[in-house]
């Protein structure tokens, strides 16, 4: 099946982009594996006009927004993000009225419709820097409450998180899990995603996005790392650092990320059916806050 996918990909002129949380078999056939922003930026650099995207809907849409002239297809239309879907345009409008003048900073894990109402987009890697560089002591931030609280801690600014209980179910780790792994691996370094709850972040050695997690073993000579994010990241790290050991903090599985399989990836290439289509107006409006992020980050 892998050979068939690679053959069809070449014949039809597709590039395969896969998120870090995809199953190992899909990461291995991808031309590029990364976080949502790395993938969107990669798509902008490509001369190829056809992209098969392996991730969830908001990520595929981000690629389309930044590459409106390219054809973007996905293997499963139902692969979505429950956290992104919790935030609605109505909630954003309501908070804009409550806090006039406060910029709306939306995490990239948000719907395209919501992005059209944002002042700036951020990622888990640059959220702290983006908020720091905004000329405002108060920001409205969504949809991840934990990331918003982390940003508040690091910037000293007032961060109003929306919606009320926005969080990623996959990253709801237990602080006790860190105690347990420290007993089992006393020399290990613990790295957790900023979407984790505060008690977990406070007990970790490092807090970072998946892109940042990849850089830590380059600087830290530890032999064992405990990873607090979706299980797919373990494969990426083991591949990059074969001489180190990577242990999951907990068995954190994103069921939506795992909806993509070798079978439906092959089917996507055969039929080219699930194309990502967005209204022109949404693309134009959602692109502005994304470009603002690039501007702020220099």
Curated annotation (Swiss-Prot):
Q: In which pathway does it act?
A: Cofactor biosynthesis; NAD(+) biosynthesis; quinolinate from iminoaspartate: step 1/1
Question: Where is it predominantly found?
Answer: cytoplasm
Task: Give the cofactor note text.
Answer: Binds 1 [4Fe-4S] cluster per subunit.
Q: Which gene encodes it?
A: nadA
**Where does the UniProt annotation locate this protein?**
Cytoplasm
> Which family is annotated?
Belongs to the quinolinate synthase family. Type 2 subfamily.
Coiled-coil intervals, chain numbering: none
Purpose of the protein: Catalyzes the condensation of iminoaspartate with dihydroxyacetone phosphate to form quinolinate.
Query: What name goes with this protein?
Result: Quinolinate synthase
- Entry's InterPro entries? NadA, NadA_sf, Quinolinate_synth_type2
What's the source species for this entry? Thermotoga petrophila (strain ATCC BAA-488 / DSM 13995 / JCM 10881 / RKU-1)
């Amino acid at each position: 099946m892998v050979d068939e996918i690679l053959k069809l990909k070449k014949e039809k002129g597709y590039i395969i982009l896969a998120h870090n949380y995809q199953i190992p078999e899909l990461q291995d056939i991808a031309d590029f594996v990364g976080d949502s922003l790395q993938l969107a930026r990669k798509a902008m650099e490509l001369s190829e006009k056809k992209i098969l995207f392996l991730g969830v809907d908001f990520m595929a849409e981000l690629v389309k927004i930044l590459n409106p002239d390219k054809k973007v297809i996905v293997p499963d239309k139902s692969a979505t993000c429950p956290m992104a879907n919790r935030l609605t345009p109505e909630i954003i409008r309501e908070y804009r009225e409550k806090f006039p003048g406060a910029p709306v900073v939306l995490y990239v894990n948000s719907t395209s419709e919501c992005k059209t109402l944002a002042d700036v987009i951020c990622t888990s890697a640059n959220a702290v820097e983006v908020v720091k560089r905004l000329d405002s002591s108060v920001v409205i931030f969504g949809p991840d409450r934990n990331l918003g609280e982390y940003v508040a801690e690091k910037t000293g600014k007032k961060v109003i998180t929306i919606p009320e209980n926005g969080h990623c179910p996959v990253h709801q780790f237990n602080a006790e899990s860190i105690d347990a792994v420290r007993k089992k691996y006393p020399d290990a370094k613990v790295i957790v995603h900023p979407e984790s709850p505060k008690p977990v972040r406070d007990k970790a050695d490092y807090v970072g996005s998946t892109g940042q997690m990849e850089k830590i073993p380059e600087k830290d000579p530890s032999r064992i790392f405990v990873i607090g994010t979706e299980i797919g990241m373990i494969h990426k790290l083991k591949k990059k650092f074969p001489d180190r050991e990577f242990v999951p903090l907990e068995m954190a599985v994103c069921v939506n990320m795992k909806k993509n399989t070798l079978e439906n990836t092959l089917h996507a290439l055969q039929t080219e059916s699930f194309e990502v289509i967005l209204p022109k107006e949404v693309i134009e409006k959602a692109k502005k806050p994304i470009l603002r992020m690039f501007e702020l980050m220099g």
